[in-house]
UniProtKB/Swiss-Prot annotation:
Its EC number is 1.5.1.36. The keyword Flavoprotein applies. This is 4-hydroxyphenylacetate 3-monooxygenase, reductase component. Homodimer. 4-HPA 3-monooxygenase consists of a reductase component HpaC and an oxygenase component HpaB. It comes from Thermus thermophilus (strain ATCC 27634 / DSM 579 / HB8).
Amino acid sequence: MKEAFKEALARFASGVTVVAARLGEEERGMTATAFMSLSLEPPLVALAVSERAKLLPVLEGAGAFTVSLLREGQEAVSEHFAGRPKEGIALEEGRVKGALAVLRCRLHALYPGGDHRIVVGLVEEVELGEEGPPLVYFQRGYRRLVWPS
């Protein structure tokens, strides 16, 4: 069942984000594809964070986090925050430079979700970057969107 479940989810395309939080001098970030818009009024987003993620206690303690929506070409950024470090990649003021958009959120709620926590954030600020194609993850790899001509 576990392998079939993973294979089924690999067939679902999703955008790629980097979620980050800072508590004192400690700043953590992680790549997340389990992210969604939850509500427009109030503006809420939700994401799933593993119980084992180093980000989780920082996010909980800070009571705030950012979500950077990655653009096509930011594969190395995604890999870096997925635990495969790349030289020269870092957060800038809690966000990924060059992202399509950055959402600055206050922690609204936390819910249990199996081996994950469901994190709900109240969006307090939106930074829009340059428009462009998003970074997409599908079938265990990064893909490009094809625009109709």
